[in-house]
């Protein structure tokens, strides 16, 4: 099972970047039912687009923002999303108690990945490698 971190999900929306191409090449090796996002990534991306829209100063910027929000929602229609369930919450509490210096949202993503015995695909190796027993890979290098 592969879980794509928020940073890589965002990168997949930017097809013109070489990192996006590298990520897609790796993803093609897996069946669609082996690739997941997390509800935490959904929340992070949703908050990002809503924040963008709130800050828009022009109608044209709003049109762009709502268009991107719509595209984001459409992309998740075909995405399997792992929940932040009780097993993940228990792991999250344990990791918090260990005082691992990783942001709360990243720690929740790590907990979901650990609860599902998955591999996390991210560019943020410096943070996620601090999480004990978490399998992480960067497919953009």
Give the location of each predicted region.
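Acidic, PIN/NYN-like endoribonuclease modules and their adjacent C-terminal/linker elements
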Residues: 1, 110, 114-141
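Short, well-structured N-terminal submotif of metal-dependent ribonuclease cores
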Residues: 1-40, 51-70
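Alpha-helix capping/helix-boundary segments
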Residues: 8, 41, 88, 109, ...
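Short, flexible helix/strand-to-coil boundary loops that buttress conserved ligand/catalytic motifs
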Residues: 13-16, 49, 96, 132, ...
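Short secondary-structure boundary/capping segments
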Residues: 25-29, 73, 81, 110, ...
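Residues at the C-termini of beta-strands that transition into short coil/loop
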Residues: 39-40, 85, 124, 140
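Active-site neighborhoods of divalent-metal-dependent phosphate/nucleic-acid chemistry enzymes
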Residues: 47-53, 75-121
């Amino acid at each position: 099972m592969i879980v794509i971190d928020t940073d890589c999900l965002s990168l997949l929306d930017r097809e013109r970047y070489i990192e996006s191409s590298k990520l897609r090449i790796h993803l093609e090796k897996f069946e669609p039912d082996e690739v997941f996002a997390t509800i935490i990534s959904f929340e992070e991306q949703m908050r990002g687009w809503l924040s963008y829209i709130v800050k828009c100063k022009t109608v044209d910027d709003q049109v762009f923002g709502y268009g991107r929000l719509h595209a984001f929602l459409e992309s998740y229609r075909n995405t399997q999303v792992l929940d932040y369930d009780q097993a993940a919450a228990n792991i999250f509490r344990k990791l918090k108690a260990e005082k691992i210096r990783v942001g709360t949202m990243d720690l929740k993503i790590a907990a979901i990945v650990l609860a599902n015995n998955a591999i996390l695909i991210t560019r943020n190796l410096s943070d996620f490698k601090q999480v004990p027993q978490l399998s992480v890979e960067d497919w953009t290098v």
